[in-house]
Design a protein with these regions (language model features):
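Hydrophobic secondary-structure block in the mid-to-C-terminal portion of proteins
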Residues: 146-212
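Hydrophobic faces of well-ordered beta-strands that scaffold small-molecule active sites
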Residues: 13-17, 40-42, 64-67, 86-87, ...
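Glycine-rich phosphate-binding active-site loops on the catalytic face of alpha/beta enzymes
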Residues: 85, 89-95, 128-137, 172-194
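Catalytic cores of alpha/beta
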Residues: 28, 71-81, 114-122, 139, ...
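Histidine/lysine/aspartate-rich catalytic loop segments that bind and position anionic ligands
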Residues: 92-126, 130-135
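Shared catalytic-loop signature of beta/alpha-barrel
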Residues: 118, 134, 139-157
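Short, ordered loop/turn segments at secondary-structure junctions
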Residues: 44-45, 69, 91-93, 111-112, ...
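Conserved N-terminal beta1-alpha1 strand-loop-helix module at the mouth
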Residues: 1-84, 101, 161-162, 188-214
Length: 214
């Protein structure tokens, strides 16, 4: 099983991919890999998601996660497609148990202290903070660092190139997630060279950010 926290901490930006045509998955993955991306999340939001996930997994440089996973059956499908981790918008004990059974890493989503406590009781330590900006962004994450020092967050939702530095400076943020690295419209338009440029820029920017002391 992938050490998801180490992988996230190394890359610091997790591209969220929404793919409508499975034929776009491999060239998209190759473009991202050429920019230095090694970790991606493909959202299970379209009819093409599962096939696209499997296609992305065929790109040897990439470790692929299934995102927007809501049910245990989707965990099984993701594992069958060779996904190495699963991300959910919320916390489901059934989904976490399925991840354990299928040997894939899990990143459940949280929005409140109660949900964080529940997720940690279930054994999770790397959590998606969603929707980050609407929940108060870095100010809320700072407040949560006191009672939950053991948790590493992946803020997603409203995080973009303009504000990611604020998040990456937080000591309890492992990485930020977002679709701005590979916008759905750019994937549809087959703008893979442009996506590679955006991904490379995001990785360079993330690499320069230094966490504040915890």
């Amino acid at each position: 099983m992938i050490d998801i926290l180490d992988a996230l901490t190394e890359q610091r930006v997790l591209p969220l991919l929404v793919v409508d045509d499975p034929a776009d998955a491999v060239p998209l993955g190759q473009a991202l890999a050429s920019a230095g991306v090694r970790l991606v999340e493909v959202a299970f939001r379209t009819a093409a998601s599962l096939e696209s996930c499997a296609a992305l997994c065929s790109v040897p440089e990439l470790s692929v996660g299934a995102g927007t996973v809501l049910r245990p059956q989707q965990v099984a499908q993701a594992a069958e497609a060779d996904a190495q981790f699963v991300i959910s918008p919320g916390t489901s004990e059934a989904v976490l148990e399925a991840c354990q059974r299928h040997g894939v890493a899990a990143i459940p989503g949280v929005a409140t202290a109660t949900e964080i406590q529940r997720a940690t009781e279930l054994g999770a330590r790397t959590l998606k903070f969603f929707p980050a900006e609407r929940l108060g962004g870095v100010h809320t994450l700072s407040a949560l660092s006191g009672p939950f020092p053991q948790v590493a967050f992946v803020p997603t939702g409203g995080v973009d190139e303009d504000n990611m530095a604020q998040y990456l400076a937080m000591p309890n943020v492992a990485a930020v997630g977002g679709s701005w690295v590979a916008p759905r419209s750019a994937v549809r338009a087959h703008e893979f060279a442009h996506i590679a440029q955006m991904a490379a820029r995001a990785l360079r920017s993330a690499a320069t950010e230094v966490r504040s002391p915890g």
